[in-house]
Amino acid sequence: LFSFESHFAHYSPGDFYKRHYDAFRGEANRVLSVVVYLNHAWQPTDGGELVLYLDDKDQEGVKVTPSFGTVVAFLSEEFPHEVLPAMRDRYSIAGWYRVNTSTADKVDPPR
């Protein structure tokens, strides 16, 4: 692994993120996705779960409640995922471990 990029994410009530991959096979340098949740006293009615799918055909997925201290890690190119609508403010730090995809001896820094 070459570097780590991250961002602080705030979802307001009603916000969601459609199903997607964090990297496309062979086209990006994100390798491992990591999410750390910062939400105290999260309740099932608060929504905002991360849903990880085994592949594009999986319609059920596995739901992860965004409770304080929960950490999720998954391969960026392998697992489609989404965030269901949040019913209250939802906070996390999302990040990606990257590999160096440099060419001609030039370093490929995080974007």
Question: What positions do the PLM features span?
Answer:
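Catalytic core of non-heme Fe(II) oxygenases with the double-stranded beta-helix
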Residues: 1-110
